[in-house]
Amino acid sequence: EACQEVKAPVILQVSKGARQYANATLLRYMAQGAVEYAKELGCENPQIVLHLDHGDTFETCKSCIDSGFSSVMIDGSHLPYEENVALTKKVVEYAHAHDVTVEGELGVLAGVEDEVSSDHHTYTNPEEVIDFATRTGCDSLAISIGTSHGAYKFTPEQCTLDPQTGKMVPPPLAFYVLKAVEEKLPGFP
């Protein structure tokens, strides 16, 4: 109803964990059901895509692609850099042959999201972004710029007390990575 009301596209995002209790075929039909429901509400051409979030193996991504997903995220950020490049490139080649878009990941975010967790973060190196995007051909890229996954974004010792409000304030975020990438790789993402 919301996509019809605001006339906006919808992304139905599925975690790897959701695949454990709802197989890819069921998820595909749920997405198709959402399209049909939007049509019943009067949306002539609903733009609804089905996206896998944090797929960590080629096999998981391939299964989703074969089941009709519109896009997949291959998260090889837990791997050494060259292995992440190789895995992402393999997924991209398979996905693009099936008209499916691919999101890669570079750098490690602290926190917990779905089954992905880390106690530390590794900021993404701008030079690696350029190399990674060029070598893998990924359509979009999740990078680590100081943000974190999950409900607990910062520990108390990372925050400062605002003297005016008495509330804890998280540290400022630095987006130098984005500026460097934009300067060296025009048009990406």
List each model region and its residues.
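Alpha/beta enzyme core
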Residues: 2-18, 26-43, 55-188
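Conserved, carboxylate-rich catalytic/transport cores that coordinate ions
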Residues: 23
